A protein has these predicted regions:
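ABC family nucleotide-binding domain
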Residues: 2-215
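C-terminal boundary and immediately downstream tail of ABC-type ATPase nucleotide-binding domains
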Residues: 220-241
Length: 241
């Protein structure tokens, strides 16, 4: 829950009076031009950035309160980045099991079995012993998603998860994300993939210049007949290319 949230980087105001409530089980896609504040919203949710003013509540924790333990937030909120951030010196299975073992202090055998199940879900069960450098970008991103799921988060944030991938690899990653959405995971996805936003997201947020200009659950109407002028311009440029 964002209440009148502002975020400055020096004199630059990245977020302007953001009000946004995301409920459990929602798949919210955030779209908009580059530099509009989309990624900053995600980085504030999991405490990578501190808000400058306003109130931000995540899973009943007040992130504006300096005493809030960010590690507790991050245990419950997974994040998948544009770049996969896998440990190059650990194999795929170890990349997935490390968090649950070290952070959640869970049983090694149990965690390994769950990791293998997750690899099966993302279509990479044969790659458990491979190292990240031996995988394609799309495969690495699917491992990163499995790693996030292994922590059993209440929500997962995706920050342009396909923008660093070759076009033919994007579909596999989006398919995995769709599976996760269908299982009821709360997801907030910053993306340029309009097909995903339209068909998988059940709510669309359009941002420009640090402001939320549209927040709608009528996703089809937003794409077919956007009312907000800046959104209309943005959609027409994308759809006509």
């Amino acid at each position: 829950e964002f209440h009148d949230v502002n975020k400055y980087f020096g004199k630059f105001q990245a977020l302007k009076n953001i009000n946004l409530t995301i409920d459990r089980g929602e798949v919210v896609t955030i779209i908009g031009p580059s530099g509009s504040g989309k990624s900053t919203v995600l980085r504030c949710i999991n405490g990578l950035e501190r808000i400058t003013s306003g109130q931000l509540i995540v899973n009943d924790f007040d992130l504006a309160d300096k005493k809030t333990d960010m590690n507790r937030i991050r245990k419950n909120v997974g994040m998948v980045f544009q770049h996969f951030n896998l440990y190059a010196n650990k194999n795929v299975l170890q990349n997935i099991t490390l968090g649950p073992e070290l952070v959640l202090k869970r049983d090694k055998a149990e965690v390994e079995q769950e990791a293998r199940d997750l690899l099966k879900m993302v279509g990479l069960e044969s790659k458990a012993d491979s190292f990240p450098g031996e995988l394609s970008g799309g495969q690495q991103q699917r491992v990163a998603i499995a790693r996030s799921l292994a922590m059993k988060p209440k929500a997962i944030l995706f920050d342009e998860p396909t923008s660093a991938l070759d076009p033919e690899m994007i579909g596999d990653v989006l398919d995995v994300m769709q599976k996760i959405a269908e299982q009821g995971m709360t997801m907030v996805v910053v993306t340029h993939e309009m097909g995903f936003a339209r068909h998988v997201g059940n709510r669309i947020v359009f941002m420009d210049d640090g402001k939320i200009l549209v927040d709608s659950t009528d996703v089809n109407q937003f794409f077919d007949d956007p009312q907000e002028p800046r959104a209309k311009e943005f959609i027409s440029k994308i759809i006509n290319h």
